[in-house]
Design a protein with these regions (language model features):
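Phosphate/pyrophosphate- and phosphate-bearing ligand-binding catalytic cores of soluble enzymes
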Residues: 2, 6-10, 52, 148-311, ...
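Short amphipathic alpha-helices in soluble, non-transmembrane regions
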Residues: 32-36, 191, 315-321
């Protein structure tokens, strides 16, 4: 019986790994790779476990827990500075490190759970800033080529919460990132209205770097976007669905009923996944299934209790996605990664052809049958 993955994921779900290796020293990576490459099943790399839904049966192969830490700084000339960060370094710690050194470019990513190495996979972003904005290249181990490679940012296929690493799971293990940041006392311009309001500044203003970083943390804590150490929301994986892309007709329909529509830079219009769930009757604290609830702070974050299983959590995701697509015709894409799924597999079981039945014990949970507003 191997080590439980539940002990290494923030949902605290998951059975045993056949073998778990903890990688702490960058210099020993060749030994780790050699040890893991002899098995038929590709190793699964685990960072902070904050975006992972491990199966109840566990994982039949090797799990590599990335626990390398540290970052180095090198001036590149003028105000440009290079930071090389190890993959196991917590992203929040890297942001704090950059801000403390007066380096701008990732200050709006503070407070996001997870490791630095996971950031390029999801192209982690917040408040109009994403890791690809300042990423120069990624150093990774290519399991197909059996060697360490360097990938330029332009080769990483970055998009909204998307990358080549995400679309080809199992091929690369990210070892470190190289970022190009700017030495500046000012943060990037504020582009999100609620953050500007919280800081009492107009949109487009470049506030002091440290002040912006502190405001981001405070805003995330107030909105339930951080990972608490204890309490009913401690077992979670953050937002469980991506904000879905809208067709022109869907965008018009959402705007017509007062729904929020977001655009990141020059990206396509997206609806708020949380807003769609709320239109289906879900609220903070709603019970979705056995041991699975909306967090007490926000609908889009699901939390688990002692009675939860990975199966019940996956079923809850399926139920929510089914209700939204049947009510609004808008499919939702789940965020949590499931170890063992191959390229082309969905993160959640296939949605049933019949409508999911609303859970009668969910508070503030009105029926949405036949309520499609457009």
């Amino acid at each position: 019986m191997g080590e439980l993955l539940a002990d290494h994921t923030t949902l605290r779900l998951g059975g045993p790994a056949h073998r778990l290796l903890t990688h702490t020293d960058p210099a020993t990576w060749p030994d780790v790779a050699r040890s893991a490459s002899g098995e038929g099943t590709a190793p699964f790399v685990l960072g902070g476990g904050s975006n992972t839904l491990a199966d109840d049966a566990g994982y039949s192969g090797t799990v590599i827990r990335m626990a390398t830490h540290g970052a180095t700084v090198r001036p590149l000339g003028d105000d440009l500075v290079e930071i090389v960060a190890q993959a196991g370094e917590p992203l929040s710690a890297l942001v704090a490190f950059a801000v403390d050194h007066g380096l701008s470019g990732i200050e709006y990513l503070g407070g996001i759970p997870g490791t630095t190495g996971a950031a390029p996979v999801q192209n982690t972003g917040a408040y109009g800033q994403q890791i690809s904005d300042t990423l120069a290249y990624v150093t990774a181990f290519d399991w197909h080529l059996d060697r360490i490679v360097e990938l330029r940012a332009s080769d990483c296929g970055f998009g909204y919460r998307a990358s080549t690493f995400k679309s080809q799971p199992g091929r690369w293990t990210i070892l470190n990132l190289t970022l190009h940041l700017t030495r500046s006392a000012s943060a990037a311009p504020v582009t999100y209205r609620h953050l500007a309001d919280a800081m009492a500044v107009p949109l487009g203003v470049r506030p002091p770097l440290a002040e912006a970083a502190q405001a981001v943390i405070a805003d995330r804590e107030q909105r339930g976007l951080t990972l608490p150490d204890s309490g009913p929301d401690a077992r979670q994986a953050g937002s469980v669905f991506l904000n879905p892309v809208l067709t022109p007709d869907q965008e018009s329909a959402v705007r017509r009923v007062g729904g929020p529509v977001h655009r990141d830079q020059n990206g396509p219009p997206r609806a708020s996944a949380g807003w769609l769930l709320e239109q289906c009757g879900y609220r903070p604290g709603s019970r979705i299934g056995p041991g699975v609830y909306c967090s007490t702070a926000r609908t889009l974050t699901l939390t688990t209790r002692e009675s939860a299983t990975a199966t019940s959590f996956a079923s809850a995701l399926r139920q929510l996605a089914t209700e939204v697509v049947e009510a609004y015709g808008i499919p939702l894409c789940p965020e949590p990664v499931r170890p063992g799924l191959t390229k082309g597999s969905s993160n959640v079981p296939a949605m049933p052809s019949h409508r999911a039945v609303a859970n009668p014990s969910s508070p503030n949970r009105p029926s949405t049958a036949g309520s499609r507003p457009w």
